[in-house]
């Protein structure tokens, strides 16, 4: 990145890869917690700097990561903000593996479909690393943009994608949603870019 090389420990031996990022197992400090009439909010932060942690050893940037969770009657909102305190720009990627219990609105597993705001498939090599090539979506992955894939019938999706908004209820949507086809009950995981 900008002439700098980052070296991380191997965490997937069979692929000789590192995964899950530098903050996955780090302890965050609860900096705020509030319970109001209609909302519960918890804010956690992590400060990386040369004097206090091993993260800096592999990723030599001083930064602050703040994660805020808000629970209301409308749902759970998660906000992630990074503050770069370094003298240089730092590369950044954020990802979460959010588990969902299905069925969450009754019925059977086959009643649920998943839709994703995907654009193109990112080609991966034998080590599951991006090759730099982008491919058109396969027929199966094209369903993610349209009617959705049956959640329990598609198997694991071991692929990377570019982001392209989809239409949900007449509005642009960036993210993933799982919907119960009979009732219309949804769980949404939406991304907003700042």
Residue ranges of each PLM-predicted region?
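A short secondary-structure junction signal
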Residues: 55-58, 79-81, 91-95, 112, ...
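Active-site/ligand-binding surface loops and adjacent short beta/alpha elements
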Residues: 89, 99-193
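Histidine-centered catalytic micro-motifs
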Residues: 22, 93-101
């Amino acid at each position: 990145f900008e002439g700098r090389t980052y070296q991380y420990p191997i965490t997937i031996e069979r692929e000789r890869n590192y995964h899950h990022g530098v903050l996955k197992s780090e302890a965050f400090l609860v900096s705020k917690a509030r319970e109001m009439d209609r909302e519960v909010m918890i804010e956690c932060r992590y400060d990386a700097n040369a004097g206090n942690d091993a993260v800096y050893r592999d990723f030599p940037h001083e930064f602050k990561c703040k994660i805020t969770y808000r629970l209301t009657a409308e749902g759970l909102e998660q906000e992630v903000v990074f503050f770069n305190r370094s003298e240089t720009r730092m590369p950044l990627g954020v990802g979460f593996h959010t588990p969902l219990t299905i069925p969450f609105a009754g019925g059977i597993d086959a009643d649920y479909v998943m839709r994703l705001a995907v654009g193109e498939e990112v080609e991966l090599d034998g080590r599951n690393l991006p090759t730099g090539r982008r491919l058109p979506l396969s027929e199966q992955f094209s369903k993610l943009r349209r009617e959705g894939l049956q959640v329990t019938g598609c198997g694991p999706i071991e692929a990377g994608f570019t982001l392209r908004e989809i239409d949900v209820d007449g509005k642009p949507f960036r993210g993933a949603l799982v919907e119960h086809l009979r009732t219309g009950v949804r769980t949404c995981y939406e991304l907003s870019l700042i």
